[in-house]
């Protein structure tokens, strides 16, 4: 059974939701193993960041994500327009199952790392520049055209595996283009949650390993609560009027 902890007790409308899994070491009967703590944060209708909750998922698979999303929805999470995260096993299917009205944005940073995994080290800087050029375009149409050119260029460089990863995965990294351009840099990656995870890892390194998943979850939630009470949660993250205008334009066009 998945254990969950809520950082906030009331529901609300959160247009942008960021999700990620952080792996911590658990000492289980003298044997060490990794346990995934699933974390969700969101930007509310007023443009402020909030930590929604965390859960122990034995592994980042579809069942864990579905359970986590259903729990969040059951606690009142509503109005979700976009979910940002890495393309881990089952994530996309879980989003479609629990939040069918929401779109999915694959984190571009994780996408780049995935392409780099099949790129010779000597070519990584060049390939990074090529990939960033795709996401620097001013429209989805232009980004798609640039991506096609990059794929051809990678093939010409004899980087067939990298070319295939770009060709197969680029579309799910361009969902942000359907939202206000003023928000693009903050909704195409889940860097906002990665920074929280780095803070958690710093704290957990002191502890070392945990006797069970629940103690790991409790420490993670304690750190998340702490961060949520700082300037991180008290400073406006984005102007949501841009989203309202975009949604109005879309409904008129529809």
Over which residues does each language-model region extend?
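Acidic/histidine-rich catalytic cores and adjacent linkers
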Residues: 133-254
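Short, small-residue-biased leader/transition segments that mark boundaries at the very start
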Residues: 2-7
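Short, flexible loop/turn motifs enriched in small residues
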Residues: 30-37, 45-47
């Amino acid at each position: 059974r998945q254990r969950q902890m809520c950082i906030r007790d009331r529901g609300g409308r959160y247009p942008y939701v960021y999700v990620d899994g952080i792996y911590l070491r658990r000492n289980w009967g003298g044997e060490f193993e990794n346990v995934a703590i699933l974390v969700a944060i969101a930007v509310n209708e007023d443009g402020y960041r909030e930590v929604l909750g965390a859960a122990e998922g034995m592994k980042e698979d579809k069942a864990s994500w579905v359970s986590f999303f259903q729990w969040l929805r059951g606690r009142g999470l509503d109005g979700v327009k976009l979910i940002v995260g890495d393309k881990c096993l089952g994530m996309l299917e879980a989003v479609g199952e629990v939040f069918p009205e929401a779109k999915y944005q694959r984190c571009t940073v994780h996408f780049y790392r995935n392409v780099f995994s099949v790129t010779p080290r000597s070519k990584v800087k060049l390939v990074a520049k090529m990939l960033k050029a795709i996401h620097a375009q001013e429209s989805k149409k232009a980004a798609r055209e640039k991506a096609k050119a990059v794929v051809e260029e990678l093939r010409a460089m004899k980087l067939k595996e990298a070319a295939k990863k770009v060709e197969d995965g680029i579309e799910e990294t361009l969902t942000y283009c359907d939202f206000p351009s003023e928000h693009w840099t903050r909704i195409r990656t889940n860097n906002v949650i990665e920074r929280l995870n780095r803070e958690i890892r710093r704290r957990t390194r002191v502890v070392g390993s945990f006797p069970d998943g629940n103690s790991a979850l409790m420490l993670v939630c304690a750190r998340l609560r702490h961060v949520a009470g700082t300037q991180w949660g008290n400073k406006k993250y984005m102007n949501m009027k841009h989203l309202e205008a975009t949604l109005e334009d879309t409904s008129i066009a529809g």
